[in-house]
């Protein structure tokens, strides 16, 4: 993308790239030799980058299924060349009526001696955004090697939707030191905002909360407005939104509300890389 800006964030082999309005996130963890890790790391990166670039051809063309199909096809094509034994544990499914990359699908060459990976992915989170030519779509992969003696490193979430709360590193660290703080998905969002405001050194009215614009999140929207905090509502793009509190390029302090369950796993992996926290 000649007109796209590229942002690299490295943290123990984790890489986030922004290409124009399509983001590519790679979350990767292993105990392999550094050289081997580096090669496979870049192959995962190329898979997500390829998906983002192919789906971007459908920006603003009103066909979200075509954008998703292009991304799936691009990722699968890259997986076919990767010397790994991969299995998709979180992928496309019934909820999306997606064209491929389903849970349980085997990816990679599965050559003898190649590393075993559990793979969680979303070829495009925010296909509606792509179809409308809007920002905040993301193509991402989280991959992990199971520990010795363990059957899996990532697990399927047996739900379509989850309640989520995401926050920046300073809030996460404070909650770790004092678990009694009302920083919880079970606490009223008004209390979470008040505590977060103190930790961030802000007035309650200056705290920005991002929420997915859905009727199921109306109770959160009402609390944020009643408290007088800033509210930023989004139509789609659950993964990007949940990671926003940990990205210095945004002014989002908290993300709250009910969104996709598979997306919760991917955004949690991203938050771990970025230092923030997420509950779901």
List each model region and its residues.
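N-terminal hydrophobic or amphipathic helices/low-complexity stretches enriched
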Residues: 32-51
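Alpha/propeptide regions of enzymes that mature by internal proteolysis
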Residues: 43-46, 55-66, 71-77, 81-84, ...
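Flexible, acidic active-site loops/lids enriched in D/E/S/T/G that coordinate Mg2+ and/or position polar
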Residues: 68-149, 155
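Short acidic loop-to-helix transition motifs that present clustered carboxylates
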Residues: 94-97, 216, 235-242
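Short glycine/serine/threonine-rich phosphate/pyrophosphate-binding segments
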Residues: 123-132, 136-140, 218-219, 239-243, ...
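Acidic beta-strand-loop-alpha-helix segment within the catalytic core
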Residues: 142, 146-233
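Glycine-rich phosphate-binding loop
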Residues: 237-238, 247-279
